[in-house]
Amino acid sequence: MDTLLLLKAAIMGVVEGLTEFLPISSTGHLILAGSLLGFDDAKAKVFDIAIQTGAIFAVILVYWQRIRATLVALPTERQARRFALNVLIGFLPAVLLGLLLGKAIKAHLFTPVVVASTFILGGFVILWAERRQQAAVRIHAVDDMTPLDALKVGLVQCLAMVPGTSRSGATIIGGMLLGLSRKAATDYSFFLAIPTLIGAGVYSLYKERALLSAADIPLFAVGLVFSFISAWLCVRWLLRYISSHSFVPFAWYRIAFGLVVLVTAWSGLVTWAE
């Protein structure tokens, strides 16, 4: 396989890993990177879905102690069952809405104006959430969440179906607006990512299975490995970062990136559509 193509796969894997769990929309960055690299044909979109697997494995590894302890304790401990139930409740709204409206949303909302608007609006929402965070925290740990809290965050996660929103951005910032601390919202967002990304990935790959080929295994493997490594580093860094910093820098980054979307769309440099 072409070495240059493998290098592009590695770069795309790094982009996926670094942006999947930050509140800045991995999809927007993958579209931009793919366009600049000339890695944006139909098979590239399947590749983008597949390399999410690496990012998912990274989160599982970071939280493995908690995940393992929960699985072991499920038959005997009420707290473990409540935690698992909260993740399930948060996961279900996106499943239902995705099956009902996923195709329509992609067909009608994937435009430069929508993508740019959601990037910019999301930035201002982060600024607002951070201002409220100082006085509105009522939940300091994931274990303190109720099923109703989980449902509310799950409903907010549905907003991530609008292109440019960011799944992690919707769940983290939505959680903060609903009263979760910055750490609790981030932890729950990561736990919620595991079933959400696995479910979306399996469903999307099944739909696009005709584009899959054994000859592409090296390409996908390179992207997955680099996605895993960069996501693992990014998640660990973010968990340390939020202990003493806010999400305000990400807000300004989103606003700037939204302007980049508009400029690249109007200039014809990038096709912001799927």
Curated annotation (Swiss-Prot):
Catalyzes the dephosphorylation of undecaprenyl diphosphate (UPP). Confers resistance to bacitracin. NCBIfam families: PRK00281.1-2 (NF001389), PRK00281.1-4 (NF001390), undec_PP_bacA (TIGR00753). It comes from Acidovorax ebreus (strain TPSY). InterPro entries: UppP. The keyword Membrane applies. It catalyses: di-trans,octa-cis-undecaprenyl diphosphate + H2O = di-trans,octa-cis-undecaprenyl phosphate + phosphate + H(+). Bacitracin is thought to be involved in the inhibition of peptidoglycan synthesis by sequestering undecaprenyl diphosphate, thereby reducing the pool of lipid carrier available. It is a multi-pass membrane protein. Belongs to the UppP family. Its EC number is 3.6.1.27. This is Undecaprenyl-diphosphatase. GO terms for molecular function: undecaprenyl-diphosphatase activity. The keyword Hydrolase applies. One of its GO terms (biological process) is peptidoglycan biosynthetic process. Signal peptide: none annotated. Keywords: Antibiotic resistance, Cell inner membrane, Cell membrane, Cell shape, Cell wall biogenesis/degradation, Hydrolase, Membrane, Peptidoglycan synthesis, Transmembrane, Transmembrane helix. It is found in: Cell inner membrane. Pfam families: BacA. GO terms for cellular component: plasma membrane. The chain crosses the membrane at residues 44-64, 85-105, 109-129, 185-205, 215-235, 250-270.
